[in-house]
């Protein structure tokens, strides 16, 4: 595995980063992950992906063109601002905060895309409140892969997931959410098919 190709970063307190890595290691059966304590960069310590969720995670990890940044906090306030200056809050435990595109030259065309930098937010406290413990790994993997697929969509379309005013592109979010690994149902949610 090319260590320079690993492009998932976790950002937050050491306690929250350790929590996320521990949850993912409990969730994944065939791979073990670790992280660089200085940079927050995730890596595979051992194993080979064998499930769809593991494969989706490894694909996100090994795509050097998409840099996934999972910001981990405790509240539903992301620490980001809306274009009107108000705090950007999430409704659940995770939130798509879009992405930006960096280019190899001043010409901002698809062929000159150097990297897409994504941002996803995870609230540990909301995750604990809204989801069963057995679903925490599934939720975290969903948030990572949603952010990754948002980056892929932006790379393919040359349209950032967040504009210069901080407005999140809802079309990119919807497509990324649909392409990501499945999200678990919150506690108490019931869905009936008629």
Task: Write out the residue ranges for each language-model feature.
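Intrinsically disordered, compositionally biased low-complexity regions
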Residues: 1-98
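Acidic active-site catalytic centers that drive phospho-/nucleotidyl reactions
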Residues: 2, 142-143
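Active-site or metal-binding loop neighborhoods of secreted/extracellular toxin and effector enzymes
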Residues: 134, 149-194
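Generic structural signal for residues positioned in beta-strands
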Residues: 9, 119-121, 179
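Intrinsically disordered, low-complexity regions
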Residues: 30, 41, 58, 85-87, ...
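Generic alpha-helical structural element
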Residues: 9-13, 129, 169
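Active-site scaffold of zinc-dependent metalloenzymes
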Residues: 69-137, 144-151
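Extracytoplasmic/secreted envelope proteins and their assembly/folding machinery
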Residues: 21, 138-141, 177
């Amino acid at each position: 595995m090319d260590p320079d190709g690993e492009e998932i970063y976790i950002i937050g307190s050491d306690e929250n980063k350790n929590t996320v890595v521990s949850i993912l290691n409990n969730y994944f059966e065939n791979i073990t992950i670790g992280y660089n304590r200085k940079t927050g960069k995730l890596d595979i310590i051992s194993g080979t992906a064998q499930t769809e969720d593991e494969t989706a995670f490894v694909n996100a990890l090994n795509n050097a063109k998409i840099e996934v940044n999972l910001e981990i906090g405790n509240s539903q306030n992301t620490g980001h601002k809306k274009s009107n200056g108000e705090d950007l809050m999430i409704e659940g435990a995770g939130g798509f905060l879009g992405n930006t595109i960096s280019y190899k030259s001043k010409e901002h065309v698809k062929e000159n895309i150097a990297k897409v930098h994504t941002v996803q937010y995870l609230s540990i406290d909301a995750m604990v409140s809204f989801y069963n413990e057995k679903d925490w790994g599934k939720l975290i993997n969903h948030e990572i892969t949603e952010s990754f697929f948002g980056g892929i969509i932006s790379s393919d379309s040359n349209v950032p997931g967040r504009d210069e005013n901080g407005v999140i592109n809802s079309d990119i979010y919807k497509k990324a959410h649909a392409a990501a690994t499945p999200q678990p149902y919150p506690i108490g949610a019931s869905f009936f098919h008629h």
